[in-house]
Amino acid sequence: MRYAMFDLEVTVALRDLPLSSEDGGAAILVRRKSVPVAFWMQATNGEGCITATALAQKIAAEAGTRIIAEAIREELAVPAGCAAPSVTIAICTRDRPGGVTRLLNSLFERISSLPRDSPTPDVLVVDNAPSDDRTREVAGRYPTVRYVREPRAGLNFARNRAMKEARGEILAFLDDDVIPDRGWFEGLGAAWSSNCDAAAFTGQVLPLELETDAQIIFEKRGGFRRGFERIRLGPVFPGNSLYPGGAGNFGAGANMAFRTRVLEALGGFDEALDTGADVPGGGDLDIFYRIIRAGYPLVYEPRFMAFHEHRRDMDQLSRQYRRSWGLGFMCYLTKCLWTDPERRVNVARLIVWWFCHHTRDLLGHLKKRLRRQEHIPPSLLIGELWGGVVGLLGGYARSRRRVDEIRRQVP
């Protein structure tokens, strides 16, 4: 059963939240003066509504500290540390004209609300080895959108093409299955203005909808969420000896931005990661890792928020777990083993931890299944583990050979 989606503003009087007979639960985003401060999912057990009283108690428990912190931040507002940058927003896509249309409509709605003295964002659509002209036709409906075609198939080929075409001081990436929040520009601007030395920025990513079992399972396991506290990441992370190798520290590639000149100086994205169906993952984690290892700060800013359309069916979700989160992640770690001798022991420890953690997770959900408790389908977790095994056993080397062949065929 689906989860009803609610977007609440705490400075407005709370009301009962109505639920239909089709709603198995509710997903609630809480804001204070448009700033996101909390998100949670809760089962509703056939109830007709969530009362305002129950809602107030839940908000106090989940968001009370953040609401107070936001009120203090508002009172102690400090001047911007540096001028607003010019921004290129890149949409790398392949054969998804519907998603591109939705994203462009939402993006230009946000752009129209910017202050008149703000730099006008540069919007770039990178069409990655398309099978037809539908995306070019979509981009052509927007007079200010630039369209380029990247003939070499693979997301990181498209990202590197965006880097070469970028005109902005900041290059932001939005996937074609997201839409930006109304505070997206303000969030990016706030992160930049108080972290002028940072080279990368990531933001909160919440579900666009929770209509299917696959979407609900994905979000219950954590989705792409990273919390509602701004985090500035540097060379070390106190208490985490595996840093910066893990996946949970940085944010998601669906919504990220970089200082363009730093991205260029680092050589752009590794085209042997995020190569499409063969290795559909790891490319965002790799560039985050390399930025940190090069000595640049990375800032996670929850106000820099987007909404993601999760995979709708279980087959799609299974492929995501197996290939993106298993194979892609382990290919990224294998690369780190090869290329970063100084951190090799830590990366090896992370690989061991990953397999142990996911094995324990699988066993835990098998027990829940036997007890008829709510659980993640074991087949998803087995697929993720198997993807990790395939990635560890030469996945990155095979991908490099494939990419070399693509470069020979399409210079």
Place the predicted regions along the sequence by residue.
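Short, well-formed alpha-helical segments that are part of the catalytic scaffolds
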Residues: 96-111, 115
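A conserved acidic beta->alpha catalytic loop
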Residues: 106, 124-136, 178
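Glycine-rich, basic loop-to-helix element that forms the pyrophosphate-binding segment
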Residues: 135-136, 150-166
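Short aromatic/hydrophobic "clamp" motif used to bind/position activated sugar donors
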Residues: 171
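Conserved donor NDP-sugar-binding/catalytic core segment of glycosyltransferases
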Residues: 183-223
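Short, flexible, basic/aromatic active-site loop/helix in glycosyltransferases
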Residues: 221-248
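A short, conserved alpha-helix in the catalytic core of glycosyltransferases
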Residues: 249-267, 272-304
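Non-catalytic, C-terminal membrane-associated alpha-helical segments of glycosyltransferases
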Residues: 320-325, 341-411
